[in-house]
């Protein structure tokens, strides 16, 4: 689930955020924080008429122009920009913490919080998600009842399991896990802040997202639109229309 990490040594004129050029990750996180998705409940594409997407692209573009957000060319540069002082903060899934905590010299220099809420968008929140993993029981399962019982007694029923795997770097957002003593432990790297309990709390407040088989087609189309807007100054409305039509074509509509 999405978090915002902020360095405690902000320098005047330093960008607040970093992002990989052409990647729609931050835009998607902002979109979900507003309770909006790239698809409607009936599965139709929701890009052109999305009430939050254009304002989000406008905000993103403005942040790039005024230097609030710095774009880098690839993932390695993205990670480097977080750790070498290029940027004062980062918004991403909680898994991004591992790229910071791997560097001992960063200990005590970072704080964790939720993400900013967009103004002027009904339903906007301070919470979102990016990435993660899920367990599912497929229709090919030969012992469905046994599989369901296993899931209920482990991943959906055992705080002891989550207490054990947190020490191995596996962070769950199952709400009851956040109430355990293991999750409430202070984390020295983050100045003894109980960041794991915080993250689970954030997860319980995150709006849902409508995905589906063509979700990444839609993400990629928005990423292309974003890249064209930032790099060539392309017209935003035209780019959103093209993105919508691209996804609809891929869906066979």
Predicted regions and their residues:
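Beta->alpha turn/N-cap motifs
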Residues: 75, 92-97, 133
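Long, aromatic- and glycine/proline-rich binding clefts that accommodate carbohydrate-like moieties
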Residues: 113, 165-221, 228
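Alpha-to-beta junction loops
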Residues: 84-93, 108
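Glycine-centered hinge/linker elements that transmit conformational signals in sensory
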Residues: 1-6, 42-72
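Short helix-initiation/N-cap motifs at beta->coil->alpha
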Residues: 70-84
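Extracytoplasmic/periplasmic substrate-recognition and gating elements
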Residues: 62-68, 103-170, 204, 224
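Short, solvent-exposed loop/beta-turn-alpha elements that line the ligand-binding surface or hinge
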Residues: 15-16, 36-55, 102-104, 117-127, ...
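Extracytoplasmic/periplasmic solute-binding protein
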Residues: 1-45, 87
């Amino acid at each position: 689930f999405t978090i915002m990490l902020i360095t405690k040594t902000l320098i005047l004129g330093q960008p607040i955020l970093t992002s990989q050029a052409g990647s729609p990750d931050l835009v998607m996180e902002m979109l979900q924080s507003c309770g909006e998705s790239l698809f409607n409940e009936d599965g139709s594409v929701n890009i052109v008429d999305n009430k939050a997407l254009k304002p989000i692209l406008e905000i993103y573009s403005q942040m790039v122009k005024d230097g609030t957000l710095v774009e880098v060319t690839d993932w390695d540069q993205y990670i480097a920009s977080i750790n070498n002082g290029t940027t004062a903060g980062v918004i991403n899934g909680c898994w991004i913490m591992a790229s910071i905590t791997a560097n001992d010299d960063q200990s005590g220099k970072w704080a964790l919080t939720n993400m900013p809420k967009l103004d002027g968008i009904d339903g906007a929140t301070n919470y979102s998600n990016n990435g993660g993993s899920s367990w599912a029981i497929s229709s090919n399962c030969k012992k469905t009842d046994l599989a369901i019982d296993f899931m209920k007694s482990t991943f959906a029923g055992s705080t002891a399991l989550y207490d054990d795997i947190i020490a191995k770097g596996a962070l769950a957002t199952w709400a009851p896990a956040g109430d355990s003593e293991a999750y409430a432990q202070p984390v020295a790297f983050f100045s003894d802040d109980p960041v794991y309990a915080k993250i689970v709390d954030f997860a319980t407040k995150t709006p849902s997202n409508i995905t589906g088989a063509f979700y990444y087609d839609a993400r990629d189309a928005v990423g292309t639109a974003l890249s064209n807007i930032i790099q060539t100054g392309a017209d935003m409305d035209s780019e959103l229309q093209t993105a919508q039509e691209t996804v609809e074509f891929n869906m066979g509509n």
